Amino acid sequence: MSDTIQIREMMKEKKRIVVKIGSSSLQHIQTGDLDYTKLDVLVRELCDIRNRGKDVVLVTSGAVAVGRKSVMMQETGSDNLTAVKQACAAIGQARLMMTYQKIFAEYNQVAAQILMTKNTIIDNLNRFNARNTFAELFKLG
């Protein structure tokens, strides 16, 4: 049995599917820009899973890389500066969410964003609030 068939069989029994996509999977291999073809395929697959009645969570990284590319900043030693990373992340996160919103809308789905940090998990109130937000989003579809 192929890996794809095995994964699909396992997913049939699951209520909630979490998919993690990293920076390198978001970027076009030649240009380093967002790879819209890959993103469209990803979103189409996620919407198909959602249409089968599953809860779907997409965990995405790449905000720093997208932001850096947006302002044409090369990766340098200065990227270690927290302020530089945060500025690139702020730019990139907005661009990522705009892209996801547009693609999900093509499939009549709504995208939402929950930004989480280590503190979201460690702090009881923050964890409670994040959990409630997820629960409400799942209820809303």
Located regions from the model:
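Nucleotide/pyrophosphate-binding catalytic subdomain
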Residues: 1-141
